[in-house]
Amino acid sequence: KGVTRLEKYASCAFAHFMAYGLRLSERQEYEFKPLDWGNLFHKAMEHFAGKAERLDIPVTDITDEMRREMVDACVEESIIDYENTVLYSTKRREYLITRMKRLVDRTVWALLRQQKMGDFRQTGTEVRFEGGVIDRIDTCEDENQVYVKVTDYKTGSKSFDITSFYYGLQLQLAVYMNAALELERKKHP
C-alpha cells in the first residue's frame, strides 16, 4: 500500500492530496438492486394488507378499480417509506415503478381471487414470532377444525420443492407454518 501511495504522489501530487489528505473518493451512484426490488414489493404488500383490513367492506368486495387505486397508493407509500425518491430520477427507474405496480396488482388480484373462491380469511399480517415474521396468515374454521395457510411474499419464481425441504435446504415455509399452527392452537385451545 505504501508503494502505491508513493507512485500516486509521483504521478500527481494533487491527486495524492485529494485521495490521502482529504480522503476523497468517487461518488457512488445509486443502483436499484434486486434486494431493493424485493423490499419495495414486500412493503407495498404490507401497506395493501393494512389498508384492506381498515376498509368498511369485506376484502372480497374490493372492485378492480379500488384494487388498482389502492395498489398505486401502496407502491407510492412504500417508495416514500423506503426513502427512495431517487427512483423518480430517470425514465428507466420510473418504468421500474410501473412494473412494480403491475406486479403488486397481479399478486393482490390473485390473493383476492383465492379469498373469493374459498373459505379462508386473512387473520394476520406481519405476524412476528421468535424465528421471524410471517407475511400473512389465513384461516378457515369449521365446527371442530381450524385450517391454516401461510403466505410468504416473494418477487422471484422460486416454488416449494419437497426434495429441497427434505434435505433442509428450503425450511422457511415449514417453520412459518409450524409457528402459525402454534399461534392458532393458543387462540383455540
Task: Label each residue range with its predicted role.
Residues 1-47:
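C-terminal, charged and often intrinsically disordered regions of DNA end-processing helicases
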Residues 124-184:
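Non-catalytic protein-protein interaction segments used by genome-maintenance enzymes to assemble
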Residues 1, 186-188:
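Accessory/regulatory regions of helicases
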